[in-house]
From Swiss-Prot:
Family: Belongs to the IspH family.
Binding site for isopentenyl diphosphate: H96, H185, S317, S318, N319, S379
Protein name: 4-hydroxy-3-methylbut-2-enyl diphosphate reductase
Catalytic reactions of this protein: isopentenyl diphosphate + 2 oxidized [2Fe-2S]-[ferredoxin] + H2O = (2E)-4-hydroxy-3-methylbut-2-enyl diphosphate + 2 reduced [2Fe-2S]-[ferredoxin] + 2 H(+); dimethylallyl diphosphate + 2 oxidized [2Fe-2S]-[ferredoxin] + H2O = (2E)-4-hydroxy-3-methylbut-2-enyl diphosphate + 2 reduced [2Fe-2S]-[ferredoxin] + 2 H(+)
NCBIfam families reported for this sequence: ispH_lytB, PRK13371.1
Keywords for this protein: 4Fe-4S, Iron, Iron-sulfur, Isoprene biosynthesis, Metal-binding, Oxidoreductase
Name of the coding gene: ispH
Pathway: Isoprenoid biosynthesis; dimethylallyl diphosphate biosynthesis; dimethylallyl diphosphate from (2E)-4-hydroxy-3-methylbutenyl diphosphate: step 1/1; Isoprenoid biosynthesis; isopentenyl diphosphate biosynthesis via DXP pathway; isopentenyl diphosphate from 1-deoxy-D-xylulose 5-phosphate: step 6/6
Residue sites binding dimethylallyl diphosphate per the record: H96, H185, S317, S318, N319, S379
One of the Pfam families matching this protein, by short name: LYTB
């Protein structure tokens, strides 16, 4: 499929909108009430530090809603204002935050049902309004909705669209796209749908397996078994790993994406030599600025003297998970929660350790003076962070 031609056609349709409806002022008060926080503003103005009795809170200097998320949420609110009585669907969570998605449900925005990773679009009719979330939708979903006569409201983050352009360049030049991402993540599913030949690698370890195979170290059957669900149809590692371009899911850990890019550059240099390198390797910077800022702020925060750290964001949020990884790498007691309600009045916290199930820890706040670092993922509103801080204040004020 010529995805570039399809996008051009879609973008010229009267039933497609990616710029909003000019109703920002009409929804501003709703957004402020639901998501903003005067307390967080005050803490920012005070050098990102709050002292309350024995509790000291240190905020990361970049956290919470990024501009892509703000744009997507605002467009969703504008859509309901513009279509007050029409049926409005969304193909997935608008962002990975439970409170934001619940607000949309309260506005009678309907979520496409999915079972086993397969979405059921049979309920979507001609004339319905369909919102594409911040991390995008597959080109096949867009095509289906367009052919069905839906009004498509595209809130895809421009940084995600940039990655789509990158893999389309790979496809046009007959390069295989190596996508650093999570195979089942909505953004990676969308990105791979715009690619030609592709292979998804989760981390540096998987990238090393690919690099080893390129250099003749590895078994074909074992390779295909490992990556069977992470590659394009009819993928042939002996043919399709000769010309590579690197792209990434925008919320992955920046340092790892960069290292993966360097690994494949070294690998292709070793195999083909410096004169032929550009014929076999392409590299584009598709790391999101907001993701990078939050990760750098987290690295600065974990250098502070902290007793523990609370990371706030959806449990299915990739960028939040990577913030948690940074805390773990420094050996800091850290707790990933998705809502303030995870903190109990009895000084317990229900949190999700990395790669594990939910766990309840008792007496998580120590006695005496305590310094708590706080950060949040790009899909977490300031209002949620405020409520977490208020919970901590209540627990340390008794």
């Amino acid at each position: 499929m010529d995805t570039q031609a399809f996008k051009r056609s879609l973008h010229h349709s009267e039933r497609y909108n990616r710029r909003g409806f000019g109703r920002a002022n009409e929804v501003a008060s709703n957004l402020e009430k639901a998501y903003q926080s005067s307390l967080i503003g005050s803490i920012r103005d005070n050098g990102y530090v709050l002292q309350h009795g024995r509790l000291q809170v240190k905020l990361a200097e970049a956290f919470g809603f990024c501009w892509g998320v703000e744009r997507a949420v605002a467009m969703a609110y504008e859509t309901r204002r513009h279509y007050p009585s029409e049926r409005i669907w969304i193909t997935n969570e608008i962002i990975h935050n439970p409170s934001v998605n619940e607000h949309l449900r309260e506005m009678d925005v309907l979520f496409i049902h999915a079972e086993g990773g397969v979405k059921d679009f049979s309920c979507v009719n001609d004339g319905d309004v369909v919102i594409l979330p911040a991390f995008g939708a597959t080109v096949q979903e867009m095509e289906l909705l367009h052919e069905r006569g839906c009004h498509i409201i595209d809130t895809t983050c421009p940084w995600v669209s940039k990655v789509w352009h990158t893999v389309e360049k790979h496809k046009k030049q007959e390069f295989t796209s190596i996508i650093h991402g999570k195979v089942k993540h909505e953004e990676t599913l969308a990105t791979s749908s715009f690619a030609g030949t592709y292979l998804v690698v989760l981390d540096l370890d998987e990238a090393q397996l690919v690099a080893d195979y390129i250099l003749g170290q590895g078994d074909r059957a074992a390779f295909m078994k490992r990556f069977a669900k992470a590659c394009s149809a009819n993928f042939d590692p002996d043919q399709d790993l000769q010309r590579l371009g690197v792209a990434n899911q925008t919320t992955m850990l920046k340092s790892e994406t960069e290292e993966i890019g360097r690994l494949f550059e070294r690998t292709m240099l070793r195999k083909y030599g410096p004169i032929e390198l550009n014929k076999h390797f392409l590299s584009f910077n598709t790391i999101c600025d907001a993701t990078e800022e939050r990760q750098q702020a987290m690295f600065s925060l974990v250098d502070e003297p902290l007793d523990l750290l609370v990371v706030i964001g959806g449990f299915n949020s990739s960028n939040t998970t990577h913030l948690q990884e940074i805390a773990i790498s420094r050996g800091i007691r850290s707790f990933h929660i998705d809502t303030p309600e995870r903190i109990g009045d009895n000084n317990s916290i229900q949190h999700k350790p990395l790669g594990e199930d939910l766990f309840i820890e008792s007496n998580f706040l120590p006695a005496g003076s305590v310094s708590v670092g706080i950060t949040s993922g790009a899909s977490t509103p300031d209002r949620v962070v405020e409520h977490v801080i208020q919970k901590l204040i209540d627990l340390t004020s008794g």
